[in-house]
């Protein structure tokens, strides 16, 4: 269903600032907290004493304390102490590889021995003072692949987002899709069009005229396990489009980290990074609020689509040219899942033979 030997965004640092956070990821119930020296830790959200969720407890001196009977858990899933009880021999619970990077907490739900922090996608905008970022989190009741489909085919903007970023020229512009290794790239360019409301506001935010024709671009990049980063923007027409000098354009990166909760639900970490007026905190908040409203327009569509697909599992869906980005992304996911299954089967055979 979803790759497990991969890094997913689990939460943001503020979510574990003062208490543990319980969150299901890839069908695994996990509790995140800050252990010794403030390092992020993640273990199974299950107390080995009576099965209570450890996320309902608290943290004391870097130890996770069960809120039911006070059992103390260490970062590696080992029981450390319990009031009035010797704990030697208590079974360990599963612990997870976690990393704090780029303003997010990342988790590896699979085999922690395979977890290499170097595999976390490099996010240039997150460590660069010339960029600003604002975002949020939505919980959506849909298969994570439906969200990938949605983001890799922005034709829907014309209809779902008609009052903000949609325009008829999106339908009319040709789409190009290519695959580079495990990365899928879908591109669309619209020349000499009028900017829709969201982008008129962005032009004004960058001190540019918003009532003149623009060249607009959308470059969607899928990377496994389920990340989609989209370069978007507008430039005054005839100034070079995507390659226009900064003084003629407003561009940004739409950030989409899609973390499966279950087979039919996701944690959707959304945001926008921009490299114009990065010190403008009010502009960052204005864009964040506007983008949040845009993404909220997708929620009902995706959730009702999921309900339809569950109700009619035998129905065959059409595949159109505009679906190429999503189709290719699913093929990448399928290859990774097949490789994980092959490795798991080989490991099982090896254990059986020993």
Curated annotation (Swiss-Prot):
This is Vanillate O-demethylase oxygenase subunit. This demethylase system consists of two proteins: an oxygenase and an oxygenase reductase. GO terms for biological process: lignin catabolic process. InterPro entries: Cholesterol_7-desaturase, Rieske_2Fe-2S, Rieske_2Fe-2S_sf, Ring-hydroxy_dOase_2Fe2S_BS, VanA_C_cat. Belongs to the bacterial ring-hydroxylating dioxygenase alpha subunit family. It comes from the Bacteria. Its EC number is 1.14.13.82. Residues 7-107 form the Rieske domain. It holds the Pfam family Rieske. Binds 1 [2Fe-2S] cluster. Binds 1 Fe cation. Keywords: 2Fe-2S, Aromatic hydrocarbons catabolism, Iron, Iron-sulfur, Lignin degradation, Metal-binding, Monooxygenase, NAD, Oxidoreductase. SUPFAM superfamilies: Bet v1-like, ISP domain. It catalyses: vanillate + NADH + O2 + H(+) = 3,4-dihydroxybenzoate + formaldehyde + NAD(+) + H2O. [2Fe-2S] cluster binds at residues 47, 49, 66, 69. One of its GO terms (molecular function) is 2 iron, 2 sulfur cluster binding. CDD domains: RHO_alpha_C_DMO-like. It comes from Pseudomonas sp. (strain HR199 / DSM 7063). Its cofactor is [2Fe-2S] cluster; Fe cation. Pathway: Xenobiotic degradation; vanillyl-alcohol degradation. Gene3D superfamilies: Naphthalene 1,2-dioxygenase Alpha Subunit, Chain A, domain 1 (3.90.380.10), Rieske [2Fe-2S] iron-sulphur domain (2.102.10.10).
């Amino acid at each position: 269903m979803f790759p497990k030997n991969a890094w997913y965004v689990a939460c943001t640092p503020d979510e574990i600032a003062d208490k543990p956070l319980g969150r299901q990821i890839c069908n695994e119930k996990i509790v995140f907290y800050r252990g010794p020296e403030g390092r992020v830790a993640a273990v199974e959200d299950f107390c080995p004493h009576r099965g209570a969720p450890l996320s309902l407890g608290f943290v004391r001196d870097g130890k996770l304390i069960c809120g039911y009977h006070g059992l103390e858990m260490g970062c590696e899933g080992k029981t450390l102490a319990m009031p009035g009880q010797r704990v030697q021999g208590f079974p360990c619970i599963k612990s997870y590889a976690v990393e704090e990077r780029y303003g997010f907490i990342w988790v590896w739900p699979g085999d922690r021995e395979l977890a290499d922090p170097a595999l976390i996608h490099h996010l240039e905008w997150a460590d660069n003072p010339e960029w600003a970022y604002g975002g949020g989190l939505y919980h959506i009741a849909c298969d994570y692949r439906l969200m990938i489909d949605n983001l890799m085919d922005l034709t829907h903007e014309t209809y779902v987002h008609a009052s903000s970023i949609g325009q008829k020229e999106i339908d009319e512009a040709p789409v190009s899709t290519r695959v580079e290794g495990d990365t899928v790239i879908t591109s669309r360019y619209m020349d000499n069009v009028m900017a829709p409301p969201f982008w008129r506001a962005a032009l004004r935010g960058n001190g540019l005229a918003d009532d003149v024709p623009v060249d607009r671009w959308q470059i969607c990049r899928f990377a496994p396990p389920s990340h989609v980063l989209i370069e978007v923007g507008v430039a005054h027409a005839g100034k070079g489009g995507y390659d226009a000098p900064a003084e003629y354009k407003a561009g940004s990166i739409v950030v989409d980290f899609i973390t499966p909760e279950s087979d039919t639900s996701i944690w959707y970490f959304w945001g926008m990074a921009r490299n114009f007026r990065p010190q403008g905190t009010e502009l960052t908040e204005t864009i964040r609020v506007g983008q949040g409203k845009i993404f909220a327009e997708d929620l009902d569509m995706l959730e009702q689509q999921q309900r339809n697909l569950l109700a009619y599992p035998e129905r065959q869906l059409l595949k159109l040219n505009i679906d190429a980005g999503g189709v290719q992304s699913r093929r990448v996911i399928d290859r990774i899942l097949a490789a994980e299954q092959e490795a798991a089967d080989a490991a099982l055979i090896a254990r059986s033979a020993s």
